[in-house]
Regions:
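Positively charged n-region of N-terminal signal peptides that target proteins for export
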Residues: 1-8, 13
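Intrinsically disordered, low-complexity repeat segments enriched in small/polar residues
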Residues: 5-7, 44, 57-60
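Bacterial signal peptide processing site
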Residues: 23-25
Length: 379
């Protein structure tokens, strides 16, 4: 309530006003009751004026029948998939393994240093929600401990073919679900290690022969009151133009010498096309579709080398808010990231400490070795 001082006029002045106001409709202040005509200042309460608020019509998003927004991309997909857990497939990124099949169907793709040897060769991990539509994905290779931890934050079933003994304690964890080997072999004229692919029916057979649930289980940390949540998606298209520290980001060169990995912004599609070995990545299993991403997340990450053979693990469990970048629509902003537990999602924050939102679409994530962070180029 507001208060105001009301100056009570002398009886003579009041009488003159009343006489002058005869015959006219006047608004009267309900708080102005004259009990004394002497001149004094009195505190009285004035009722707040409540203005009629214009009722704003909230725009309700029209939900296509039988569809829901994917927790991996925020794109509309079949509602029957809502509770289905994704798979995370290890894909060989050696030049001999090219071309890759099925990567354009992945929702999230990780690129990680697979070894400190051989020019820090990378391996890809493709996270796929609608794995039932896979016709051919791969070629499939071995996993590393880091991949087990990253797959766990999606509650994804890791698909691989073996790996060094360093993976054993991670695979033994109750939260770990994985299928190792036994996928189809394709006669492609290459050495045997480049011939294994996840093909139609493989995953159904694997699930049928296992005790793993096809649906999210109790180890999934991404469930909230609105459903399954991992990334925070923006309701509107983000441009980053108004964000602190924004820089132009149309070309990204990653410090992986063997693969010469890069991302180039495509003005027509408004996405980042992936390149390796100086060539644009295409998927012959999907009409030579370009592997392209709406979002790019780069994480500065320390690592531990196990032995002289180059086997290593990223220290991806880190609560110290390490550096990173988020890229979309040709711009980049500095961010920090944390992952506080094996099954916890990696969270990304802006320079004010707020969790970032990202655009609807596919996402590329790379853990960049901390000793090579200075060699990361964003232009």
């Amino acid at each position: 309530m507001k208060r105001k001082s009301v100056l009570f006029l002398t009886s003579v002045v009041l009488a003159a006003m009343l006489l002058g106001g005869c015959g006219k409709d006047e608004e009267k202040d309900s708080a102005s009751v004259l009990d004394d005509v002497s001149e004094e200042t009195v505190e009285v309460e004035e009722s707040e004026v409540v203005e009629a608020e214009t009722e704003e019509t909230e725009e309700t998003e029209e939900i296509p029948e039988g569809m829901y927004r994917s927790e991996l991309t925020n794109e509309w997909i079949d509602e029957s998939l809502k509770d289905q857990r994704p798979i995370a497939a290890m894909v060989d990124n050696e030049k001999t393994a090219l071309p890759h099949y099925g990567l354009s169907d992945a929702d999230v793709v990780y690129e990680l240093m697979n070894s400190t040897k051989n020019g820090r060769i990378t391996r890809l991990m493709a996270v796929v929600k609608d794995w039932g539509k896979i016709e051919q994905l791969g070629s499939v290779r071995s996993t590393r401990p880091t991949n087990i931890l990253l797959a766990a934050e999606w509650n994804a079933v890791l698909c691989h073919d073996g790996g060094p003994f360093y993976i054993d304690p991670y695979l033994a964890e109750d939260y770990s679900a994985h299928f190792s080997g036994g996928f189809d072999r394709i006669n492609n004229g290459k050495a045997r290690e480049f011939t294994e692919y996840i093909c139609t029916g493989n995953l159904d057979s694997k699930f049928d022969a296992s005790n793993y649930s096809r649906e999210y289980d109790k180890y999934y940390e991404g469930k909230d009151v609105d459903g399954y949540q991992h990334f925070q998606f923006s309701d509107e298209e983000l441009t980053l133009d108004d964000k602190d520290g924004v820089i132009n980001a149309t070309t990204v060169s990653l410090p992986f010498p063997h693969n010469e990995s890069a991302l180039k912004y495509n003005e027509e599609t408004k996405t980042y096309d992936y390149y390796d070995y100086n060539n644009k990545h295409v998927d012959p299993g999907n009409g030579d579709a370009v592997l392209t991403f709406k979002n790019v997340l780069l994480q500065n990450c320390t690592f531990h080398q196990y032995d002289e053979n180059g086997y290593m693990i990223y220290n991806c469990l880190d609560a110290s808010n390490r550096d990173g970048y988020y890229l979309t629509n040709g711009k980049a902003i500095p961010i920090t990231w944390v992952k506080v537990g094996d099954t916890n999602a990696t969270r990304y924050y802006d320079m004010d400490g707020n969790e970032i939102s990202i655009n609807t679409g596919k996402t590329y994530i790379s853990l960049v070795p901390d000793d090579g962070w200075k060699d990361l180029s964003i232009e």
